[in-house]
Amino acid sequence: AGGGHVVRALPSYCASFLDYVCLGDVEELGEVVRDAFGPQYAAEEHHPRFDLAHYIGRVGHVESSRYCNFSCSFCTLTGEGRPYLPVSADELRRQLQAVGRKTYIGINDNNFFGNNRKSFKERVAVMREGVESGLFRGWTALVTNDFFLKRENLELVRDAGCTGLFSGVESFDTAWTSRHNKHQNAVRPQVEVIRECLEAGVTFLYGMMVDLATRTIADIRAELDFIVGCPEIPLPSYISIPIPIPGTPFFYECLDSGRILPGTRFRDLDATTISVATLDPLAEAAEFARDLQSMRGYRARIARHSVRFAAANRRHLSPVKLGLALYNAALLCEPLLTTLPKNTGQAAGRRTHVSGTEPLDGFYRPKFRVDSRFEKAFQPTVLIDARGCLNEEIADDIAAGRDALLPRRGAVAAV
């Protein structure tokens, strides 16, 4: 059985590999178990058994909502078009009790804030209960930028024990964020939002996207120079390259304009590999993408920024919150893949950071001998072939995804 966005975007293609193509949420696995093993093996209600996950440490995780009420063009949630769905206060409380006593709780939502004010306040109240009862010391969540339009929202979560908030800044260039339908980021200046959050005593975390397809290397370097030269704001938690994920408006825009590089495979869509034609020469862009993985050329300035940021914010943030913000410096100066599981196997060769030329990693080498009929399962799925054309094996799924997206996103051009 398989699920997730790739399966939802390519259901017909994936059916050739999977016994069960799951297009819904994780609870659909109950139906798989009922069909494959019998109804006696499937629970009537979905209650995760955190007690069986002995490896969970001091940080627990819960889910207080699903999906998002915004439609950023590069986001898989936009491609799937599901409405924002918060859970009830009772359900969130039940999850917290199941997780048990932890030091911190991470709320694994796409958007903790959402568009339901009543639900938001109820869920914050539940998190306050957990802190006050000693179930955990603090918590973190992801919110969209509209959360910061009213200071009372920030004060509400801070007083409820919120340690840190992650928000998708993506770029300080509001023209770029607006181009990707992320208009909520243009309502207030981002530096002002970040400063207000920090001064309220809540760590602000964010990520950056460097779009080499629409911005020059010089332009992106100027933005990075601004960040490392501004001690008022923390460093980003990550810096990634935009991905043309099938099913999203951004994907169809790139597909229709012929900008996805020939030979691009699904395994290349990893946020560290260039898969869309760049403004600068591709060789220069690839070298820049490689240097970004360890922030080559910025490490000394990152160290200075960390010292200055700590000095500027130690009166606002506790040692734990300050440490959370400063941890980003270590994340940026280490290759992105070092944060992934270590047992996935190493790539068989030097990385190129260009789609279609990246060496394959251990996922494509079976650990033991398998029958030849499974050979295709260990080959990367081609998105765009060597001629620059869409892979015919997935063409029907891609067309169906466009048809489903058009009613929701009229800006997506028809085939």
Model-derived segments and their meaning:
Residues 249-251, 267-415:
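Radical SAM enzyme core and accessory elements
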Residues 48-204, 210-212, 225:
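Radical SAM [4Fe-4S] cluster-binding motif and immediate context
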Residues 20, 104, 164, 234-236:
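Residues at the N-termini of beta-strands
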Residues 6-13, 70, 115-117, 175, ...:
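Flexible glycine/acidic-rich beta-alpha junction loops that bind and position SAM and/or redox cofactors
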Residues 15, 30-37, 93-103, 227-230:
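Alpha-helix C-terminal capping segments
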Residues 10-16, 152-153, 214-229:
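Catalytic cores of alpha/beta
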Residues 1-46, 247:
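Glycine-rich beta-alpha loop elements in corrinoid/cobalamin-binding modules
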